[in-house]
Regions:
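Active-site- or binding-pocket-proximal scaffold segments within functional domains
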Residues: 1-332
């Protein structure tokens, strides 16, 4: 039976339901898990900022996800990968690993640690030519067939790399079919570096707020977090992700009030490139706070301009009260 295999990498271990949930936690909680869709979640590690422990823990996270795929993936399944903050770094590492060596047969699961260390998160950088040689070797071991696995959708919220962890390869993620990366205009934690998604199939859009406002977590402005979650969910639905529809499943339905929430944080601002793609919710904020233009490039491209209409479609319509004709009311 063909199915969706959804993998979610969070950025920092926390207790779910305490108000510190990130968008990765929220998305995982919204998944409709069944025989047709299974999910895996990793809560992240507080040690990723330290070089020795950080690389070890990042490899362990990617290794757990890869092992889940080895044990559960079947040919024809769709793989969808999500990551928030530092979890976005691991999400891209797993995606690159799938595009290089694919998924090992279950009988080789004892090689997972080696594969992750050598080809997922190596200590030294490899050239594009070296990555191509690795892919060719993997195909040869697979009886000459292409062993790469496509990632149907890659969803990222302000993906970060702690300076202690190695830079990801610059070669494009050619196995990604579609994706979205929500990035924070107003910067992120000191010392971490924004990790751009190396694929022209991943739409990268800037959102108002700091890192926690886009990725979620402690100190986040929840209305802004909901806007970024809604955008990633919209792409996930289009890619085939099935979300719960029961009464306890609450998907975001942002409106103009949400776009005006919070204040412009004075944190480590990021320099946006010319013609940066901005989420249309920023335009709502600019009308009320034109001084925010100082943080933006001279030329921008507006993205997701129907976001308000999408929110209205997700909100159940209120019941329209019946209008009783005056003559009937008088007769009664």
């Amino acid at each position: 039976m063909l199915k969706n295999v959804v993998l979610c990498f969070d950025q920092l271990r926390h207790q779910p339901g305490t108000g510190d949930d990130t968008n990765a936690t929220a998305l995982f909680g919204l998944l409709d898990q069944s025989d047709h869709q299974i999910g895996w979640y990793h809560a992240g590690s507080p040690r990723w900022a330290r070089q020795r422990d950080g690389l070890t823990d990042a490899r362990a996270s990617v290794g757990e996800a890869y092992t889940f795929l080895v044990r559960n993936f079947e040919p024809g399944d769709r793989v969808l990968v999500f990551g928030a903050g530092r979890g976005g770094y691991c999400a891209q590492a797993l995606t690159r690993l799938l595009g290089t060596v694919g998924i090992l047969p279950p009988r080789w699961d004892d090689l997972v640690d080696y594969v992750v260390c050598a080809y997922g998160l190596p200590r030294t950088r490899r050239t594009p030519r070296e990555w191509a040689l690795v892919a060719a070797l993997a195909a040869e071991l697979n009886d000459g067939d292409d062993s790469t696995i496509a990632v149907t959708y890659l969803g990222l919220w302000d993906a970060l790399r702690p300076v202690a962890l190695p830079k990801p390869p610059s070669a494009p993620l050619s196995n990604v079919r579609a994706g979205r990366h929500a990035m924070a205009v107003d910067g992120g934690p000191f010392g971490d570096r924004l990790v751009s998604a190396c694929s022209d199939r991943v739409e990268q859009v800037w959102f108002r707020g700091g890192h926690c406002d886009v990725a979620g977590g402690a100190g986040a402005c929840e209305p802004l977090t909901g806007i970024a979650l809604d955008w990633i969910l919209d792409g996930a639905r289009a890619a085939g992700v099935v979300l719960r529809t029961d009464d306890t499943a609450v998907s975001p339905a942002p409106d103009q009030t949400d776009a005006l929430a919070g204040s412009a944080r004075s944190v480590a601002l990021r320099r946006l490139p010319s013609d940066a793609r901005l989420h249309a919710s920023i335009d709502v904020y600019l009308r009320a706070h034109p001084e925010y233009w100082r943080r933006l490039p001279d030329r921008v491209v507006w993205s997701d301009q129907d976001w308000l209409a999408r929110g209205e479609r997700l909100v159940p319509a209120a019941a329209t009260p019946a209008v009783v004709p005056a003559e009937l009311a008088a007769a009664s």
